[in-house]
């Protein structure tokens, strides 16, 4: 076996470090919690949520990508721990070939990009729900299916694009690692992903404010006002998820980028210490079902109280005009 396939001393030190093992255990804990949270999130989305059918389709697709990522990364985390505990005496058996890792890396990228593109798909669907003159069940399903297919194509192609011309001739510590020949392309993907999550956040806030602005147009029509409030609440939940994803994604991409820039100026041990904790994708995958459950339950409770207020509230026309004027100032 060639020397290229044998782990260097710094790789062995990294695998043997307490920081690496702790970070992998934390990631595995996040993965396990994500599985349980996803189970309850799926039940709530299907049976108890206030979302339109198109939104449910996309939320379930996002939950699929969440678990696809967690499963693929969880397998690799277990492998890292196994090599760190039991294979340090076999340095020429630790590394994995980039050729064998390529299919696994592509699956990992499908899950990663699927979570990001899926959030964009949710916001596009919310835009349709907000600005379309009619958004009936049949139209909602058609839009949801079309957007989900676009997300599927984009997420599936991401891994293939990153590895497009990679010769895959090297060896790596784990299949989640990117070979040197495609690092610039992967860095570009990370930056674009952060920009996209920022775009998602801005669009979600714009849609939310747009809905709030016209909330009182139907003040004296209980049914129409309820539909408008339902739209605001469902969009608010998606906006909340977009904010969470942006914060974690910014921490990931910005942290990794800074570490790569200063890598030559710091010790390898310092670089690997921080890069283990900047990799926040397992927490992005965990927070999606957890926050989804939280928002649905909180909104349902608040919605019940608001419905009581809508049906019992008495307001004069002058009060209504004053409220509209205050809203526009």
UniProtKB/Swiss-Prot annotation:
Membrane topology: Multi-pass membrane protein
Gene Ontology CC annotation, any one: membrane
Top-level taxon: Eukaryota
Location(s), subcellular: Membrane
TM regions (residue ranges): 26-46, 68-88, 104-124, 143-163, 187-207, 238-258, 273-293
GO molecular function, one term: G protein-coupled receptor activity
Matching InterPro entries: 7TM_GPCR_serpentine_rcpt_Sra, Nematode_rcpt-like_serp_alpha
GO BP of this protein: detection of chemical stimulus involved in sensory perception
Keywords: Membrane, Transmembrane, Transmembrane helix
Family: Belongs to the nematode receptor-like protein sra family.
Protein name as annotated: Serpentine receptor class alpha-6
Gene symbol of the encoding locus: sra-6
């Amino acid at each position: 076996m060639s020397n290229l396939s044998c782990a260097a001393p710094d790789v062995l030190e990294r695998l043997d470090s307490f920081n690496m093992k702790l970070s992998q255990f934390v990631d595995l804990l996040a993965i396990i919690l994500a599985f349980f949270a996803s189970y309850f999130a799926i039940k709530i989305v299907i049976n108890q949520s206030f979302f339109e059918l198109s939104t449910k389709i996309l939320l379930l697709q996002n939950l699929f990508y969440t678990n696809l990522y967690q499963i693929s990364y969880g397998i690799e985390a277990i492998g890292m721990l196994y090599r760190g505990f039991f294979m340090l005496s076999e340095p020429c058996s630790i590394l994995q070939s980039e050729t064998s890792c390529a299919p696994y890396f592509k699956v990992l990228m499908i899950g990663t990009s699927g979570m990001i593109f899926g959030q964009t798909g949710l916001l596009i669907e919310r835009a349709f729900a907000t600005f379309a003159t009619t958004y009936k069940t049949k139209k909602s399903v058609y839009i949801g299916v079309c957007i989900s297919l676009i997300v599927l194509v984009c997420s599936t192609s991401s891994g293939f694009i990153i590895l497009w011309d990679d010769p895959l001739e090297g060896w790596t510590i784990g299949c989640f690692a990117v070979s040197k020949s495609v690092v610039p392309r992967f860095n570009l993907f990370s930056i674009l992903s952060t920009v996209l999550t920022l775009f998602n956040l801005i669009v979600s806030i714009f849609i939310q404010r747009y809905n709030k602005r016209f909330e009182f147009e139907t003040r004296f029509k209980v049914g129409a006002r309820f539909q408008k409030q339902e739209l605001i609440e469902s969009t608010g939940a998606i906006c909340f998820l977009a904010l969470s994803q942006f914060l974690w994604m910014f921490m990931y991409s910005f942290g990794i980028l800074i570490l790569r820039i200063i890598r030559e100026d710091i010790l390898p041990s310092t670089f690997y210490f921080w890069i283990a904790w900047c990799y926040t994708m397992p927490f992005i995958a965990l927070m999606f079902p957890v926050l989804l459950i939280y928002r649905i339950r909180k909104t349902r409770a608040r919605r019940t109280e608001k419905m009581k207020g809508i049906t019992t509230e008495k307001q004069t026309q002058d009060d209504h005009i004053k409220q509209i004027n205050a809203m526009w100032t």
